[in-house]
Amino acid sequence: LPIHIPKEHLEQWLVQSIGAKPVGSGNYPVDVIDVNENFGADAKMLAWSGKPGSASNETSLLQKFKDAGNELDIAFKQNKFDGVVSDWARLLKKKLNKVKKDYEKIQKIYYFFLIREDRNFHLCGMEVNVEKLSLISVDKSSKSSVWIKDFIESRYGESKIYKSKKRMELRLYPSN
């Protein structure tokens, strides 16, 4: 059986390994902050098959589309995908800027990923350039999803908005 690690343990490992301070207990945009190093970070756990070129499972980046003031199902039905992506970008930017507002010294936001490949683990991270979130756009779309261009380089992963789950998700390509 694969190893299962509770999110709380992952967060604590991150706190201990980088000397940061835990925040939010799951109800905040990031899991840790380091005001001395001026960053906040969110810890994410992903599973991956290990097959070269394959994607990991998904992790949620944002789930509160109702705050956009639009009805996601209607936007999909009317093929208003540019509006869907710009609404999600605005909401994600607002979510992450809350950290910078609450902690004035925070300048950078990171995602740290622990990727489980059976019994092996890989660690990677990415900086989120919050100011460039307004530049993301539609890559392609279907009746139930919108793939996002320019959130992450396509060789490293893909980001998608799922209509049915009403959330924005990220998958990584760990072998790349």
Q: For each of these PLM feature ranges, what is it?
A:
Residues 1-28, 45-176:
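Nucleic-acid endonuclease domains
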Residues 27-40:
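Short acidic loop-to-beta-strand element that houses the catalytic metal-binding Asp/Glu
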